[in-house]
Design a protein with these regions (language model features):
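Beta-sheet-dominated scaffold domains
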Residues: 1-182
Length: 182
């Protein structure tokens, strides 16, 4: 992903790392090069990686991370974005299906939302929601006790009334509008 005039490559899910791609040409004095940025933290897929304001957020097998916090503190657990819900993330989600997660920035509401499969299921029916309007951010979960709409994918789209609306696409080909009111 391109972020702040840098090209970043997230490696995972086994050998976790983030790398910078430097250079401006395939050969010569300014040839492309891969420079390690951090090890021990990396992305598990491109669908869960997105921007929040001036930062990137992404899930890994170890938790949900902020690139800014990772740059400052590395893989220090206390700096994980999902630190307040880390035991839930590590104990209650299906880790063999983590790579199928989907995330979206619902910017008009100040929410970062990811869909995950709970333990014992391959259906992504649990949503982890990070409200970044507050400092520190606040976490919530939709579908933790009762499955929510199974979301194979998530999207925020602008309706004809210029209102941003959250949608979930299911494996059966249906699209559900998740935003029902302000």
């Amino acid at each position: 992903i391109s972020h702040k005039n840098e090209l970043l490559v997230f490696k995972g899910p086994n050998r976790l790392s983030v790398h910078r791609i430097t250079g401006s040409s395939p050969t010569g004095a300014d040839a492309f090069a891969r420079v390690p940025f951090v090890t021990g933290v990396g992305g598990i897929n491109h669908n869960g990686l997105f921007r929040i304001n001036d930062d990137l957020v992404f899930p890994s097998p170890r938790g949900i991370h902020s690139l800014a916090a990772t740059a400052a503190f590395g893989d220090y657990v206390e700096a994980f974005l999902a630190r307040p819900i880390l035991s839930h993330y590590q104990d209650s989600l299906n880790h063999s299906a983590l790579s199928t997660n989907w995330g979206v920035n619902f910017q008009s509401k100040g929410l970062a939302i990811w869909s995950f499969a709970p333990s014992g299921s391959s259906t992504k029916s649990v949503y982890l929601v990070y409200d970044y309007r507050f400092q520190p951010g606040r976490w919530a979960s939709w579908g933790i006790n009762t499955p929510y709409v199974a979301a194979n994918c998530l999207a925020v789209m602008q309706t004809t009334g210029r209102k941003h609306t959250l949608f979930a696409g299911t494996e059966g080909g249906y699209v559900h509008q998740l935003t029902v009111s302000d």
